[in-house]
Every structure is written in C-alpha cells, then in structure tokens.
C-alpha cells in the first residue's frame, strides 16, 4: 500500500502549553534494513506521556509526538527483516524501539538496560533523529521491538499492556510472583490496576496498598484478596509484620511512601521493587540498617520476551484491564491530559479513531 512520505501526529508544541497539542507533520526516521512501518489504530496514554510533555523529566526537543503503547498493522517490512511478521498483521510497540542487540544485557533478555537504549519518543538515535511516538498515523521501529497481538485481545485493551502492563509484569515474574506467594501492589492507578489483575492471574495472594479506602471497592472487583489503607491503619508495617514476599511500588510519586515502615511487613529476603519514575526533585530517604535482609530495587520496563509472555497470559486467562477510550486528536489528547492530571480515569486511557483523524 502507499502512504505519505511525512507522518502526521498530535504533537506537543512546548512544555508551557503541553495540554494543547497540535496536529503536525514531520519526517519519519530513515528506513533501515530491519525496520518495520506500522499504521496505528490505537495508542494508550501513559503517565510518562504527561511527565515528558510537561517537562517533569527535563526539557525535550519540540515539537514532540508522545505515546508508547502502540497497536496497529504492519504496512512495510525492511529488506532484511527476519521477524516472521507479515504485512497486514496486527502488532504492538511498547516504550522501547532500539538497543544494540549485541551486548550481554541484550543477549540475556535485558534490552531495557542496554546502554544504547532508545525510548519510543523524545530520545535521539545514534544518527541524531529524535524518536516520535504513537499519537500519530504511523510509526517506524526496529523489528525486534514489534510483537504480535493475540487475536482475542481487542486493540484498546492490548495497548496499555505494552508499557504499563509490561512494566509491572517484569518485576512480578522476575521476583517469583505465583501460587503460595503474598504480593503487595502499592498505588491503585493505571499501572497498579494492571498489576493487581496480573498478580492474581499468576496465582499470588494479592494485597492492594493505598493511602485511603477510596478505591477499596474497585480493588476487590479486580480480584484483590486484601486492601490496606495506610493512612487509616497507623503503623501498617507492624500490623502486617512478616507478611510479604514481594511489594511492587506503582505509585507515580514516592513522596508519600514511607520506606522505613514498609520493610517491617516484608518476610526475610523479601523484595521491594519500584517501577515509578518520579519528578526530578524527589529523593528516597532510608534509615541506616533498617532493611534487615530486605532489598529495595528499581525495575525499568521489561524485555520483549516478557512482553510476549504477558500477552500470552492475558490471552489465556482472558484478563480484562479497565480502560476508557477517547478519540485521538487535539481535543481528545487535551481531555486525556486534563483528566489524568486530576486522577479522573478508571484506570487507563486508550486513544482510538485513528482512521477518522488521519487520512492518507
């Protein structure tokens, strides 16, 4: 099929006016031998999109098309493609579009930790091109970072899995989440909601840990076994002493999380893993020697192997994540940003209606 030489997206024009993006045409990256072009039909709205758009993580080159939970169909394969994907196949792209694929990290399914990592938008490739994301009609990426979407997962539900879902699945699977384990999910936002559903599907006894009881009913509907409202339970670490094998911190900010209370609730050898990337000014404060055989670490995204595992799990277990859809476009992106900033979403947004917004 034919498609335009320039791509078109809903682009952030400045950090100061980040909630009011404009439809913008731009040059795609050069097409290399192992690249794939994808015509986009849905894209999730991730908290990272807001952090980048608003400048929370520093100044970005503008204009910038964000969005890294992309679902669409293959329209072009590079001449040396060996991915097994076909033109017309429905596929997904998450928050990473390049790594060296040659270092020990890449060869051991740790692509997100490669020193040549390129994120789906806002980061320059080695040739200087700054990556552009999925609030657009097309995206061009290396084939390694393109995955097939199982037929029984609708596009609007598949999209949030590609970053948010993977980001919480990776620390769960790497740290033994499963039958006989007690797992805590801190923060019932978009990622925490998926973490709750995924942890239960993996067979763990699952606790949702939040500041108040406001989301208790939703947590129970998602299958949580227990709910802890930390501001209402005092020293909850003492109350739940020696309970958790694993806690995954999904909260967008670390400011209100007391890492000196949480270790009390951990079993010996327990692990606390944060997937949050807070604003630049935030710092983690710990009392010396307070961990007592408990480890605290950070997890970034997840591997392509893990993404395929996650999609298989969601397909086989028929997991239905909680998603609202909005039409892609200047107004739709504005609404998504406004509502996400206010916390007015249950629990992820997916942009749809790409065929109506973009015409080749």
Swiss-Prot record:
**Listed GO CC annotations:** cytoplasm; nucleus
The cross-references to SUPFAM superfamilies, in alphabetical order and at most eight, read: GroES-like, NAD(P)-binding Rossmann-fold domains
Q: Which cofactor does it need?
A: Zn(2+)
| Top-level class of the enzyme under EC nomenclature | oxidoreductase
Cofactor binding, note field:
Binds 2 Zn(2+) ions per subunit.
Q: Which reaction does it catalyse?
A: a primary alcohol + NADP(+) = an aldehyde + NADPH + H(+); (E)-cinnamyl alcohol + NADP(+) = (E)-cinnamaldehyde + NADPH + H(+); hexan-1-ol + NADP(+) = hexanal + NADPH + H(+); 3-methylbutanol + NADP(+) = 3-methylbutanal + NADPH + H(+)
State the source organism's domain of life: Eukaryota
* Residues annotated to bind Zn(2+) 2: 100, 103, 106, 114
Q: What else is known?
A: Present with 21700 molecules/cell in log phase SD medium.
Which PANTHER family does the UniProt record give?
ALDEHYDE REDUCTASE
Question: How does this chain assemble?
Answer: Homodimer.
Q: Which family does it belong to?
A: Belongs to the zinc-containing alcohol dehydrogenase family.
Kindly provide the name given to this protein in its UniProt entry: NADP-dependent alcohol dehydrogenase 6
Organism of origin is Saccharomyces cerevisiae (strain ATCC 204508 / S288c) (Baker's yeast)
């Amino acid at each position: 099929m034919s498609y335009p030489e320039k791509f078109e997206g809903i682009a952030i024009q400045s950090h100061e006016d980040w909630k009011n993006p404009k439809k913008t045409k731009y040059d795609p990256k050069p097409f290399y031998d192992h690249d794939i072009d994808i015509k986009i039909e849905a894209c999730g709205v991730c908290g990272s999109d807001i952090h980048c758009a608003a400048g929370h993580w520093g100044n970005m080159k503008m204009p910038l098309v964000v969005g890294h939970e992309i679902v669409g169909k293959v329209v072009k394969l590079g001449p040396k493609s060996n991915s097994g994907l076909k033109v017309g196949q429905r596929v997904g792209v998450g928050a990473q579009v390049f790594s060296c694929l040659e270092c020990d990290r890449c060869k051991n399914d740790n692509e997100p930790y490669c020193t040549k990592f390129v994120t789906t938008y806002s980061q320059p490739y080695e040739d200087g091109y700054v990556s552009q994301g999925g609030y657009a009609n097309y995206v061009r990426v290396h084939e390694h970072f393109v995955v097939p979407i199982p037929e029984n997962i609708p596009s609007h539900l598949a999209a949030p899995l590609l970053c948010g879902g993977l980001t919480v699945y990776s620390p769960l699977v790497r740290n033994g989440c499963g039958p006989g384990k007690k797992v805590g999910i801190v923060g019932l936002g978009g990622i925490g909601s998926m973490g709750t559903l995924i942890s239960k599907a993996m067979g763990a006894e699952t606790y949702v840990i939040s500041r108040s009881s406001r989301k208790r009913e939703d947590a129970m509907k998602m299958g949580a076994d227990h709910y802890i409202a930390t501001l209402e339970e005092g020293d909850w670490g003492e109350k739940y002493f020696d309970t958790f094998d694993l806690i995954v911190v999904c909260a967008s900010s670390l400011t209100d999380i007391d890492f000196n209370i949480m270790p009390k609730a951990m079993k010996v050898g327990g692990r606390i893993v944060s997937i949050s990337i807070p604003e630049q000014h935030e710092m983690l404060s710990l009392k010396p020697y307070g961990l007592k055989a408990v480890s605290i670490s950070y997890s970034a995204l997840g591997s392509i192997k893990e993404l395929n595992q996650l999609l298989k799990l969601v397909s086989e277990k028929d997991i239905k994540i909680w998603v609202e859809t909005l039409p892609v476009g200047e107004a739709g992106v504005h609404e998504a940003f406004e509502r996400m900033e206010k916390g007015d979403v249950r629990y992820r947004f997916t942009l749809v209606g790409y065929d109506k917004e973009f015409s080749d």
